[in-house]
Amino acid sequence: MTSIIFSAKDIFEQEFGREVRGYSKVEVDEFLDDVIKDYETYAALVKSLRQEIADLKEELTRKPQVSSAPSPSHPDPIDVAASSSMTNFDILKRLNRLEKEVFGKQILDNTDL
C-alpha cells in the first residue's frame, strides 16, 4: 500500500521559491488551502472507514457461525415430491375403487342396453 507523502501541515508550511515571472502568490495560497481541506476531509473519511471496518469485524466474530448443512426444519424438496406423488397415487387408487363400488352397478346396467 502506498503511504501518504504529505500531511495537511506539510502542505500548509510548504515554501515556494520566487522567480521574476512566477505564479500569483494569492492563487497558490488559495489552491493550497483547498488542497489542505481535501486532505483533512480524506483523513477523516479514512479514519471513519477504518473504524467501521473494525466494528464490522468485531460484530462478525461475535455472531455464531452458520453451518452450510440444510436445517432439519426444511425437508428436502425431492423427498417431499416423492412422498407427495406416492400419496397422490394412493388417493387415485382409492378413488377408482370407490367409483367402482358406487357406479359399478350403473355401468353394468348401461351395458345391457
Swiss-Prot record:
<keyword id="KW-0133">Cell shape</keyword>
<comment type="function">
    <text>Divisome component that associates with the complex late in its assembly, after the Z-ring is formed, and is dependent on DivIC and PBP2B for its recruitment to the divisome. Together with EzrA, is a key component of the system that regulates PBP1 localization during cell cycle progression. Its main role could be the removal of PBP1 from the cell pole after pole maturation is completed. Also contributes to the recruitment of PBP1 to the division complex. Not essential for septum formation.</text>
</comment>
<dbReference type="InterPro" id="IPR011229">
    <property type="entry name" value="Cell_cycle_GpsB"/>
</dbReference>
<keyword id="KW-0132">Cell division</keyword>
<dbReference type="InterPro" id="IPR019933">
    <property type="entry name" value="DivIVA_domain"/>
</dbReference>
<feature type="coiled-coil region">
    <location>
        <begin position="36"/>
        <end position="63"/>
    </location>
</feature>
<dbReference type="Pfam" id="PF05103">
    <property type="entry name" value="DivIVA"/>
</dbReference>
<keyword id="KW-0131">Cell cycle</keyword>
<dbReference type="GO" id="GO:0051301">
    <property type="term" value="P:cell division"/>
</dbReference>
<keyword id="KW-0175">Coiled coil</keyword>
<comment type="similarity">
    <text>Belongs to the GpsB family.</text>
</comment>
<feature type="region of interest" description="Disordered">
    <location>
        <begin position="61"/>
        <end position="82"/>
    </location>
</feature>
<keyword id="KW-0963">Cytoplasm</keyword>
<dbReference type="GO" id="GO:0005737">
    <property type="term" value="C:cytoplasm"/>
</dbReference>
<protein>
    <recommendedName>
        <fullName>Cell cycle protein GpsB</fullName>
    </recommendedName>
</protein>
<comment type="subunit">
    <text>Forms polymers through the coiled coil domains. Interacts with PBP1, MreC and EzrA.</text>
</comment>
<dbReference type="InterPro" id="IPR007793">
    <property type="entry name" value="DivIVA_fam"/>
</dbReference>
<dbReference type="GO" id="GO:0008360">
    <property type="term" value="P:regulation of cell shape"/>
</dbReference>
